[in-house]
Amino acid sequence: MIRFAPSPTGDMHIGNLRVAIFNYIEAKKRNERFLIRIEDTDIERNIEGKDQEILQILDTFGLQYDDVVYQSKNFSFHQNFAYKLLNEGKAFACFCTPQELEKEREQAKKEKRAYRYSGKCENITLDEASQRGEPFVVRIKKPTGTIEFDDIIKGHLAFEPNEVDSFVILRADARPTYNFACAVDDMLYDITLVIRGEDHVSNTPKQIHIRNLLGYDKKIEYAHLPIILNEEGKKMSKRDKASSVKWLLEEGFLPEAIANYLILLGNKTPKEIFTLDEAIAWFDLKNISKAPAKFDIEKLRFINRAHLQMMSEEELEKALGVDEGLGALAKIYLEEASTLKELNTKIDLVLHGKRENETFREEIETLRNLLKSMELPESFDEFKKELMQKSGLKGKKFFKPLRILLTGSEHGPELSELYPAIKNRIKEVIQ
């Protein structure tokens, strides 16, 4: 089984979405079940409704999953496994106060060294811990040897015992920590591959260590994706609007175009424009670059326009939420618009834009009055010829006011292109 494990603590960002897409693709390629595991153990930070929002986004992107589970439902399993390690002497009760630990951290900072747990409580026996009757956290004992694994993207990685350290697996209120819950759940659901961001690299040896001490011997593969940088070359954060999947969708980027771009980002692909189903056929995690990739909104706009151009007029009408027959108009405006939002603005201008211009006020009025009573011919050439004759206007004094009257704008596609698409609405829009 392959899993995508988001936390319901905020809006989904493009880094999360990329992880979801890659996990979905690998599940399809390997013919494995795709699990959504909502990691809701951080109760204080959970935001109500964010889990449903995440699932809705996955649906929007066509990432079909087989099951949804909540990590908090497995608390009893996490606790039992933690007490098992405690009873076997592979973990210990730690009574160190937050103040004591902070003092140790400050000391490490002064000495310019990485903080490591002092080991103060490591030799307290289970009997002694029980007799004290005080709250305690459970810490797993640090490994005795190097923890090594092969990352599909990063290659061979090794972590010394001190880097893994004796870390907390169960809080004083008996809730599991992130790493412990994650390691146990990957065992419970028989996860075979974990794809996630490289900010989790330091968590991986801890999770391997937990499973080793629990006697789990099934191999789990790992692939840690490099971070996505913003246009200034810094790590993308919530301050970057484009990092929010919700914002991208609201701006009129298509789910299929966003997916296309995220698969393309820092990857070797046989072509630039493709669908999710096409990517499943050739996608290979080994082709992902180890280096961070820079997010380029202009590149996304280019890809989005390509996907819009591939849509039929009917599909465009549905995506834009416009009346039947306006797909042809949308197709024409794709020469100068790259998103659904921009297309809607262009179409709205044609249908509802102000037909006013001080320079050509008289000409606009003349043309408007003629068009109200004129029977519109099929071809633009006939239309232009008849209107020129009836109005007595020509050149700039004809074409400029005609464009303003028909489109609500001084610039845009050729009127000969636009005419067939708006002919049936001309009398309506010039009012």
From Swiss-Prot:
Residue positions of motif 'KMSKS' region: 235-239
Enzyme class, spelled out: ligase
EC numbers, comma separated: 6.1.1.17
Annotated GO MF terms: ATP binding; glutamate-tRNA ligase activity; tRNA binding
Pfam family for this entry, one: tRNA-synt_1c
Keyword set, alphabetical order: Aminoacyl-tRNA synthetase, ATP-binding, Cytoplasm, Ligase, Nucleotide-binding, Protein biosynthesis
Disulfide bonds: none
GO biological process: glutamyl-tRNA aminoacylation
SUPFAM superfamilies given in the database record: An anticodon-binding domain of class I aminoacyl-tRNA synthetases, Nucleotidylyl transferase
Reaction catalysis annotation: tRNA(Glu) + L-glutamate + ATP = L-glutamyl-tRNA(Glu) + AMP + diphosphate
Major location category of this protein: cytoplasm
Keyword Repressor carried by entry: no
PANTHER family assigned to the protein according to its UniProt record, in alphabetical order: GLUTAMATE--TRNA LIGASE, GLUTAMATE--TRNA LIGASE, MITOCHONDRIAL-RELATED
Family: Belongs to the class-I aminoacyl-tRNA synthetase family. Glutamate--tRNA ligase type 1 subfamily.
Quaternary assembly: Monomer.
The protein, known as: Glutamate--tRNA ligase 1
Gene: gltX1
